[in-house]
């Protein structure tokens, strides 16, 4: 998975939670780096993207819109999950309107994380190419 988080401590905690779920984690430190990662990786390289919202240079909403507007079909399909302290209903709506597939509030609850992983783990859009 790709974890997009500008705060090093938050990134370390989130990466450890994801690794505890058996995942390999790459980190991008802002939205621009996330867009670049998805623009240059092979199709299917990342099964999911966990995206912080409030980041310097490019926020999570704008990064998601840029990823979704890519000419690459893979970028239109890869599940993107907001992982943010913004937890109000309007924040969830804004994430979904930007093109994200789900929203997790920080601090991340391990059960909610596992449910989100299961929700997207076996969808065709998240499969590695053969």
Predicted features along the sequence, with ranges:
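C-terminal compact regulatory domains
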Residues: 1-130
């Amino acid at each position: 998975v790709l974890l997009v988080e500008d705060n090093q401590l938050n990134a370390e905690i989130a990466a450890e939670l994801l690794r505890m779920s058996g995942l390999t984690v790459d980190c991008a430190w802002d939205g621009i780096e996330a867009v670049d990662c998805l623009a240059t990786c092979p199709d299917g390289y990342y099964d999911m993207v966990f995206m912080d919202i409030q980041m310097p240079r490019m926020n999570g909403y704008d990064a998601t819109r840029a990823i979704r507007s890519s000419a690459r079909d893979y970028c239109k399909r890869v599940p993107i999950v907001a992982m943010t302290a913004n937890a109000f209903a309007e924040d969830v709506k804004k994430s979904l309107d930007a093109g994200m597939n789900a929203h997790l509030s920080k601090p991340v609850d391990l059960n909610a994380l596992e449910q989100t992983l299961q929700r997207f783990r076996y969808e065709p859009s998240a499969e590695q190419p053969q």
